Amino acid sequence: MKVLALRHSVAQVYADTQTYLHDDSKDEYENAFLISNLTTHNILYLNYSLKTLKILNKSGIAAVEVQSPDELFALIRCNFTYDYENNIVYLHDYSYYTNNEIRTDQHWITKTDIIDYLLPGWKLTYVGYNGKNTRGHYNFSFICQNAATDDDIIIEYIYSNELDFQNFLLRKIKERMTTSLPIARLSNRVFRDKLFPSIVNIHKKVINVGPRNESMFTFLNFPTIKQFSNGAYIVKHTIKLKQEKWLGKRVSQFDIGQYKNMLNVVTTIYYYYNLYYSKPIIYMLGSAPSYWIYDIKQYSDFTFETWDPLDTPYSTTHHKELFFDKDVNKLKDNSVLYIDIRTDRGNMDWKEWRKIVEQQTVSNLNIAYKYLSTGKAKVCCVKLTAMDLELPITAKLLHHPTTEVRSEFYAILDVWDIITIKRFIPKGVFYAFINNVTTENVFIQPPFKLKTSPTDYIVALYALSNDFNSRQDVINLINKQKQSLITVRINNTFKDEPKVNFKNIYDWTFLPTDFELKDSIITSYDGCLGIFGLSISLSSKPTGNNHLFIINGTDKYDKLDQYANHMGISRRSHQIRFSESATSYSGYIFRDLSNNNFNLIGTNVENSVSGHVYNALIYYRYNYAFDLKRWIYLHSIGKVAVEGGRYYEHAPIELIYACRSAKEFAILQDDLTVLRYANEIEGYINKVYSITYADDPNYFIGIKFNSIPYEYDVKIPHLTLGVLFISDNMIHDVITALKKMKTELFKMEISTSYTYMLSDNTYVANASGVLSTYFKLYNMFYRNHITFGQSRMFIPHITLSFSNKRTVRIESIKLRINSIYLRKIKGETVFDMSE
């Protein structure tokens, strides 16, 4: 959903668009709530309130002020991520395809021959980091840039087994045009760039678990963040390989040698970060022209010093000369060295060239060892070739994708590797490594152990759900880690599957009830964005690839109506009720009937079940941005801080009724996941509330009326406003509560319109207009530890006779209250009050 705020209405009609006029009779929160539950994708918000826009954005719903028709057209035609703190819109708009254009935010690609393999008549455009270079296209009142690129297609091609790039590109563009936008992937980079600076500013020690290549630039500015990944492929792992021969396989039609070099250097930088927590000087031997240096410098400021007879235009300092063994003493401490020296074959005989390459490999290793043998804080990445060779058993082997699989690979060495044991590796084993292993991640740090780290802030995005982790260990980590942001895959199945297949792995699934947390927020991607200053125009869809975002140790926990709140809680319900269901009242009717309340007159205004909890349960796949457990807990301890809106405090029994309705809904839908979730939420409610039931009552509150429009044979027909189980010394507390509620009690607009047999030999009249006051009275008694109400649903009725009678229907008549009293069952009246 996107909310576009306008001062004036527009004449043009847009598809899937609805207009909302600010209601001045309601406050900003109530207007925001009403907007959030509208069912169209685009909301044109007229006569808007800035406070309402802020509320929506903090809830993760993109709400932007629009000042011109051009701005409106730009935002209504595509989805976007909005940095509402800095007023920056990041469009995810692929309409540039209509210019016969694909886009990249990686400069090195523009220096390759990729243009020869594009679709006929198409071009490649460099748009800068997250599309920053496109800002000049939009002369808007807010900062706007188009972050959409085709780098995902290019990178997927590089790692695929396909060679024909044009066919691959064509298929992927067609897929993009016929499937829903992967909005979370597109906005994730914006999110990471917003998230980590804010965390590092607050927390000195930060752990990041499971980063992938898409984050390779994000963390360049954060050397102090400790990374954990899947570990490195080291020399001693080659013992499992059987010898093979040269393969000579083409990987890419266009030249990706620069991409390989960039990955090698970035891998080395992150390896250095995890050892020394600071930025190194980067020395490079060979690898000209290294256009990719420009890409790295767009993200972070590094000093590059390079040696190569050819130009390296983006290097900080370039020596247009060869580098020799004797030059090693020119290299300073606190640095990384990338050795990419190899003579081009040209027209040379392959045997002669092979001999030179092997000599250069030995020379490269000698330079590496000499560099690492003196000084401090050094890491080296060195180019090697498949040959009989001795290497340290702890050396890290790299084989990032390159244009052709031939005989080259790389090794990362640190100061400890050069003093460890070396192992002889035959040429055939290195070929086996080259032919069968592709390094898929620039992060080669050790795997994360599922243990708490009291002094660290742990970030684990999309990293811990894999079934090679113990599910219980993941739960324990989340329960016990004081400060963290961790995601787990939400259980979107209908059969309550404990794990699901995703790509080539299995992931555990989770529900919010799997965790026992306090001072933590459990929300969706959208809800998490709102907490960190972002909002999004396309909410998460229940695709099966959805995650719970669990934030431990946040100062936003008590701000119940500002973050991870109830915005949009009824949206899915509205979509169903106003399009597919038997009546728009279907939800109200079902909730009452499933709790054996058969008086449906006015069910939409006087419902006996919490609609919030009911919708949060049955449609949890659509509205799990709302942190239901937090909402319940803060209510249970009386610490609900509400800024605005039409606030209604639910009685705990209303929440229980909602769970019962949700369970019946789940049974009818054969939804085992909702069934378990509702059962566990009901258990949680009973855990945090101290609910007691007057199932064996000794007192009741009665209401006597001036007159009753039915025949009766009881002595005094009355409405039982609830039963109590109290000791005699609590009578005073009950009377005090009734006196406090006197005005509200006598203001009740009670009406009746029919009679019915409540049970065998119990003839009663219905009573409407009672429930909201009953639940307020329930809350007052609950807070004073007075047992009030039974475990079955309270059905307001007026007892007329204890014999069988014919039912009667009349026009609804308002009843005037004569008195309200407290009486002992089968005893005397102990308190009576009149208006």
Curated annotation (Swiss-Prot):
According to the record, the residues making up region (2'-O-methyltransferase activity) are: 246-428
| Biological process, per Gene Ontology | symbiont-mediated suppression of host innate immune response; viral process
UniProt protein name:
Protein VP3
Does this UniProt record's set of keywords contain S-adenosyl-L-methionine? yes
Domain notes per entry: Contains a bipartite N7-methyltransferase domain, a 2'-O-methyltransferase domain and a GTase/RTPase domain. The C-terminus contains a phosphodiesterase domain that degrades the 5'-triphosphorylated, 2'-5' linked adenylate oligomers produced by the host cell in response to IFN stimulation.
Q: Per its UniProt record, what PROSITE patterns does this chain match?
A: SAM_MT56_VP3
Instruction: Tell me which domain of life the UniProt entry assigns to the organism this sequence originates from.
Output: Viruses
Locations listed in the record: Virion
Q: Which organism is it from?
A: Rotavirus A (strain RVA/Human/United States/D/1974/G1P1A[8]) (RV-A)
Specify where the region named N7-methyltransferase activity lies, as residue ranges: 171-245, 429-555
Q: Does the keyword tRNA processing apply?
A: no
Report the GO terms under cellular component: viral nucleocapsid
Functional summary from the UniProt entry: Multifunctional enzyme involved in mRNA capping. Catalyzes the formation of the 5' cap structure on the viral plus-strand transcripts. Specifically binds to GTP and displays guanylyltransferase and methyltransferase activities. Has affinity for ssRNA but not for dsRNA. Capping activity is non-specific and caps RNAs that initiate with either a G or an A residue. Together with VP1 polymerase, forms a VP1-VP3 complex positioned near the channels situated at each of the five-fold vertices of the core.
Pfam families in alphabetical order = Rotavirus_VP3
Stated EC number for the protein is 3.1.4.-, 2.7.7.50, 2.1.1.56
Q: MF terms per GO, please?
A: GTP binding; hydrolase activity; mRNA 5'-cap (guanine-N7-)-methyltransferase activity; mRNA guanylyltransferase activity; RNA binding
For region GTase/RTPase activity, the annotated ranges are 556-692
Its quaternary organisation is: Interacts with VP1. Interacts with VP2.
What chemistry does it catalyse, as a reaction equation?
a 5'-end diphospho-ribonucleoside in mRNA + GTP + H(+) = a 5'-end (5'-triphosphoguanosine)-ribonucleoside in mRNA + diphosphate; a 5'-end (5'-triphosphoguanosine)-ribonucleoside in mRNA + S-adenosyl-L-methionine = a 5'-end (N(7)-methyl 5'-triphosphoguanosine)-ribonucleoside in mRNA + S-adenosyl-L-homocysteine; 5'-triphosphoadenylyl-(2'->5')-adenylyl-(2'->5')-adenosine + 2 H2O = 2 AMP + ATP + 2 H(+)
User: Catalytic residues per the record?
Assistant: H718, T720, H797, T799
**Swiss-Prot/TrEMBL keywords:** GTP-binding, Host-virus interaction, Hydrolase, Inhibition of host innate immune response by virus, Methyltransferase, mRNA capping, mRNA processing, Multifunctional enzyme, Nucleotide-binding, Nucleotidyltransferase, RNA-binding, S-adenosyl-L-methionine, Transferase, Viral immunoevasion, Virion
Family the UniProt entry places it in? Belongs to the rotavirus VP3 family.
Q: Where is this region: 2'-5'-phosphodiesterase activity?
A: 693-835
